[in-house]
Amino acid sequence: MKVNGKKALVFGGTSGIGLATAKELASLGAEVTAVSRNPEKAGDVPEGVTLRQCDVRDREAMSQLFQECAPFDILVSAATGGDRAIGPFLQMDMDGYQTSFDKLWGYANVVRFGTEHMSENGTIVLV
């Protein structure tokens, strides 16, 4: 995929896979906005990458962010929503289930609100 000159939003773009994705897209010439719940904890975000704060579980904030950043061509969701529920499904407690579903809602919010503001033939990547 050619990304030079494309506009990209990377949720979870300040650490881990999201940060690596933001760096790669920027190095290939994309205009990148890295979105994080906690941008103050951002890793080594490259120069030229814009940082924005937003929690993927907050629908109002997501809607506002997408309106402000539109239109864009590439949408990446690598946000975990914070806590992680790890373990066999039947051995998790109710908090673990809630954490898992919160993460799912985060992905749903990215896709639901993001597609309204994407350019035609845009690309979505869910990590």
Language model region names:
Residues P46-E60:
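Rossmann-fold cofactor-recognition segment
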Residues M1-L9:
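Flexible N-terminal pre-Rossmann segment of NAD(P)-dependent oxidoreductases
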Residues R57-P71:
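Conserved Rossmann-fold cofactor-binding substructure of NAD(P)-dependent oxidoreductases
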Residues V35-E40, V56:
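N-terminal Rossmann-fold cofactor-binding loop
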Residues F11, F72-G81, L126:
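Rossmann-fold scaffold of SDR-type NAD(P)-dependent oxidoreductases
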Residues T14, A22:
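N-terminal Rossmann NAD(P)H-binding glycine-rich loop of SDR-like oxidoreductase domains
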Residues V76, S100, V110-G114:
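Hydrophobic positions on the long internal alpha-helix
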Residues T80-D95:
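Conserved mid-core segment of classical short-chain dehydrogenase/reductases
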